[in-house]
Amino acid sequence: MGLHPDGDAPHAAATTLPMSSPAKPLPSTRVWRDWRLLTLATGMALGLFAQIGLLAHLFSLLVPALDAQLAGFAAGGATASAILGRTLVGWLMPARADRRLFGCANYAVQILGSLAFLFAAGDNIPLLLLGVVLFGAGIGNTTSLPPMIAQAEFSQEDVSRVVPLIVAVGQGTYAFAPAVFGLIRELAPRWGSASAGAAPWLFLAAALIQILAVVAFFIGRPRKA
């Protein structure tokens, strides 16, 4: 608004960081062939696919061990964990940090959550709750970090194209996640006398998909000159 605090010089220049990368804009025909976009869209889509697929079945997998009421509170705890995870990234990520590495770390935390669910075997309550906290911590960052990565890697003109593209790819991909994870849950063989809440193949699938998402983010890191 052009206003300044009392005592400041009226024309004092504010120090600001650029909102996007100084990279040159890409021709419209080359956007989909850009390695950064391909790896960013792939990493986001895979991460969302694993996340939505697992979350769609999480409540029903918690019920056998926690009962419906406590399972509802636990599922709500994932949302609280998501808020905390997003806040921590906001505090810890420097303005000029390699945001892809933070995206990789975010998926790594969720992978640990999937493994906690796996080793809980459907009835180890402390591990189930640990899984909720770890997996939930990445929920918000999975959607917020990819646009921030695009902002750091693409020119201002390209950001307005890249962000809608990666979001559309992610949405089109994760729309099928609940059904695919449901098929895994129903058709995969059971492990011995596992409890009703055990779904080892589902949690393994989530972890493996997110490992692929980590790889996609990592190999797309811009090369330093």
Put a short name on every predicted segment.
Residues 10-37:
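Juxtamembrane intracellular "pre-TM" segments in multi-pass secondary transporters
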Residues 45, 127-141:
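Hydrophobic core of transmembrane alpha-helices in multi-pass small-molecule transporters
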Residues 85-98, 185:
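Helix-to-loop junctions at the C-terminal end of transmembrane segments
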Residues 139, 153-190:
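A late C-terminal transmembrane helix in Major Facilitator Superfamily
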Residues 101-116:
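Structural signature of the two symmetry-related core transmembrane helices
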Residues 204-225:
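Multi-pass alpha-helical transporter architecture, strongest
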Residues 34-90, 177-178:
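Extracytoplasmic gate region of multi-pass secondary transporters
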Residues 183-209:
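A membrane-interface helix-boundary motif in multi-pass transporters
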